[in-house]
Amino acid sequence: MRPSGRKTDQMRKVSFERSFSKHAEGSCLVRFGDTHVLCTASLEEKVPAWLRNGGKGWITAEYGMLPRATGERMRREAATGKQSGRTQEIQRLIGRSLRAVVDLPALGERQISIDCDVIQADGGTRTASITGAWIALHDCLKWMEARNMVKLEKVLKDHVAAISCGIFANQPVIDLDYLEDSAAETDANFVMTGSGGLVEIQGTAEGKPFSEEEFASLMLLAKNGIAELVEMQKQAIAG
């Protein structure tokens, strides 16, 4: 039995609140249960120096957690003077995931900066960030299209979403919350496109190694869960 009472293949309640920020070209407050992340997409009419005059754009991402997003207050990373390895890993993952479904030449020599700020954390912050960031990116590109800057369908080639899966109490389960994640025997994150392409898989055995059969079970859970998330994204942008 999962602590939340959910079935092994049951995700937490997921919601997307678009245009949460009035300033950003695209924004979305995404909720995976009690994990809440504000994702914004900001347009810059420039690219990094190493991309100048290359005829293509760039998507980059930053990730952070508010001090009281967790049970005990954390120091702001800005106050410590450096980002943790975890933060750097997650923001690179978000950027890679979004670039996988973007035609960078079609964007032109522009950069879209994605900011994912965790307001409240209860497990799965990186997967929620990727899934919500896609909505923010979509809405930023839609804003650009309304100003004849790009064609949305030419830049954004597909959906992308992510979900965590793991082995908890000897059972493969989907969308782990903090209690499950902290006690899981195996923890994995899956990033996939709407058409079923794999973008990234991160999997770690916390205790005993997991078998190929167990991995296949996690993969199936993730595939079905991400298909659900993509449908939710479609419904969100249609509204």
UniProtKB/Swiss-Prot annotation:
<protein>
    <recommendedName>
        <fullName>Ribonuclease PH</fullName>
        <ecNumber>2.7.7.56</ecNumber>
    </recommendedName>
</protein>
<dbReference type="InterPro" id="IPR050080">
    <property type="entry name" value="RNase_PH"/>
</dbReference>
<comment type="similarity">
    <text>Belongs to the RNase PH family.</text>
</comment>
<feature type="binding site">
    <location>
        <position position="86"/>
    </location>
    <ligand>
        <name>phosphate</name>
    </ligand>
</feature>
<keyword id="KW-0698">rRNA processing</keyword>
<dbReference type="InterPro" id="IPR020568">
    <property type="entry name" value="Ribosomal_Su5_D2-typ_SF"/>
</dbReference>
<dbReference type="GO" id="GO:0000049">
    <property type="term" value="F:tRNA binding"/>
</dbReference>
<dbReference type="InterPro" id="IPR001247">
    <property type="entry name" value="ExoRNase_PH_dom1"/>
</dbReference>
<keyword id="KW-0694">RNA-binding</keyword>
<dbReference type="Pfam" id="PF01138">
    <property type="entry name" value="RNase_PH"/>
</dbReference>
<dbReference type="GO" id="GO:0000175">
    <property type="term" value="F:3'-5'-RNA exonuclease activity"/>
</dbReference>
<comment type="subunit">
    <text>Homohexameric ring arranged as a trimer of dimers.</text>
</comment>
<dbReference type="InterPro" id="IPR018336">
    <property type="entry name" value="RNase_PH_CS"/>
</dbReference>
<keyword id="KW-0808">Transferase</keyword>
<dbReference type="Pfam" id="PF03725">
    <property type="entry name" value="RNase_PH_C"/>
</dbReference>
<keyword id="KW-0819">tRNA processing</keyword>
<dbReference type="InterPro" id="IPR027408">
    <property type="entry name" value="PNPase/RNase_PH_dom_sf"/>
</dbReference>
<dbReference type="GO" id="GO:0008033">
    <property type="term" value="P:tRNA processing"/>
</dbReference>
<dbReference type="GO" id="GO:0006364">
    <property type="term" value="P:rRNA processing"/>
</dbReference>
<keyword id="KW-0820">tRNA-binding</keyword>
<dbReference type="GO" id="GO:0009022">
    <property type="term" value="F:tRNA nucleotidyltransferase activity"/>
</dbReference>
<dbReference type="InterPro" id="IPR002381">
    <property type="entry name" value="RNase_PH_bac-type"/>
</dbReference>
<comment type="function">
    <text>Phosphorolytic 3'-5' exoribonuclease that plays an important role in tRNA 3'-end maturation. Removes nucleotide residues following the 3'-CCA terminus of tRNAs; can also add nucleotides to the ends of RNA molecules by using nucleoside diphosphates as substrates, but this may not be physiologically important. Probably plays a role in initiation of 16S rRNA degradation (leading to ribosome degradation) during starvation.</text>
</comment>
<keyword id="KW-0548">Nucleotidyltransferase</keyword>
<dbReference type="GO" id="GO:0016075">
    <property type="term" value="P:rRNA catabolic process"/>
</dbReference>
<dbReference type="InterPro" id="IPR015847">
    <property type="entry name" value="ExoRNase_PH_dom2"/>
</dbReference>
<feature type="binding site">
    <location>
        <begin position="124"/>
        <end position="126"/>
    </location>
    <ligand>
        <name>phosphate</name>
    </ligand>
</feature>
<dbReference type="InterPro" id="IPR036345">
    <property type="entry name" value="ExoRNase_PH_dom2_sf"/>
</dbReference>
